[in-house]
């Protein structure tokens, strides 16, 4: 049969109450905030004929600026995860989530995760939402160097931005901008972010685009909640270490091209942990492909 172990984290002992920051080779299984059991990775390999690691790629990229230690700064994944968990567990009655109600929110990052932060902040009751994007604003229609059937590099206004436009009357995104410093009040709480405009220039030798700060373009954005959605750096390393699986240069679990088997016998991987942060449709595809590979490993063939 197949057994799904959800919410799995690495813990360093039975009494560990915060497995998300622990290290070691003990596995702690959690379901809806309830501790189920502790078991070593080696024990799982002894008990099961195959183990599929599908732990995501949630290691967030941080920002290295003065004032980063201020209160009121969260990674996007923590903000979104606590919101969803509190909603499902208690419809927010437990209060175990980061709330944007009444806050001026600054979202750092213009991708899908940043969009989710914008939409969630608005639904929680934020009084202002600003989203920073380092890249230039894309055109609304295809450029001459982006013909069909290439993927259209055009401006996309997702649900979060659409809700912001409907509520505040303007697009929350500010392009070609980054944070230089975070300002704290006397209590150590974030109260503003000092930003600077960016310019992108093409290197004549390499052809690569490089960004540089525009002199005298600094300005300040008032905010009391900052959500960092600056991308992800691959999977959490402690899971891979527990099973002894190798990571590639992108810190995703390494496999042969088009395969899901790791360097460890009986251990497979799929989803974001395998290919890096992506959309749920890819996670579904990866899960199906990994299941077929495991089926073939166990039975010698697969019926799809």
Residue ranges and their predicted role:
Residues 89-126:
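Rossmann-like NAD(P)H-binding beta-loop-alpha module
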Residues 115-117, 273-298:
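A conserved FAD-binding loop/helix module that cradles the flavin
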Residues 3-5, 74, 174, 268:
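General small-molecule cofactor/ligand-binding pocket signal
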Residues 7, 101-104, 176, 264:
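Phosphate-coordination loops involved in phosphoryl transfer and adenosine-cofactor binding
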Residues 1-65, 180-194, 199-202, 225, ...:
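Feature captures the FAD/FMN-dependent oxidoreductase FAD-binding
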Residues 71-102, 201-277:
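FAD-site-proximal beta/loop scaffold in flavoenzymes
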């Amino acid at each position: 049969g197949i057994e799904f172990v959800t919410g799995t984290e690495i813990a360093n002992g039975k009494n560990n109450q915060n497995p998300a920051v622990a290290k070691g080779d003990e596995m702690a299984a959690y379901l809806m905030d309830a501790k189920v059991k502790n078991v070593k990775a080696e024990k799982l390999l002894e008990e099961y004929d195959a183990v599929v690691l599908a732990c995501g790629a949630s290691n967030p990229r941080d920002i290295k600026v003065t004032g980063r230690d201020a209160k009121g700064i969260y990674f996007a994944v923590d903000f979104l995860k606590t919101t969803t968990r509190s909603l499902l567990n208690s419809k927010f009655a437990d209060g175990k989530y980061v709330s944007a109600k009444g806050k001026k929110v600054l979202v750092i990052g213009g991708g899908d995760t940043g969009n989710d932060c914008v939409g969630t902040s608005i639904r929680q009751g934020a009084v202002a939402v600003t989203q920073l994007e380092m890249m230039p604003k894309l055109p609304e229609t295809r450029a001459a160097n982006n013909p069909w059937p290439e993927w259209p590099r055009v401006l996309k206004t997702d649900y979060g931005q659409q809700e912001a436009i409907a509520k505040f009357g303007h697009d929350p995104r500010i392009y070609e901008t980054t944070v230089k410093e975070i300002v704290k009040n006397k209590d150590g709480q974030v109260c503003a972010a000092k930003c600077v405009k960016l310019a992108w220039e093409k290197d004549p030798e390499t052809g690569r685009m490089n960004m540089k700060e525009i002199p005298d373009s600094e300005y300040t954005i008032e905010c009391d909640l900052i959500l960092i959605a600056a991308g992800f750096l691959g999977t959490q390393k402690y899971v891979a270490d527990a099973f002894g699986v190798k990571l590639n240069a992108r810190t995703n679990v390494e496999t042969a091209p088009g395969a899901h088997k790791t360097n460890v016998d009986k251990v497979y991987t799929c989803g974001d942990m395998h290919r890096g942060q992506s959309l749920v449709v890819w996670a579904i595809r990866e899960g199906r492909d990994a299941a077929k590979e495991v089926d073939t490993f166990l039975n010698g063939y697969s019926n799809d």
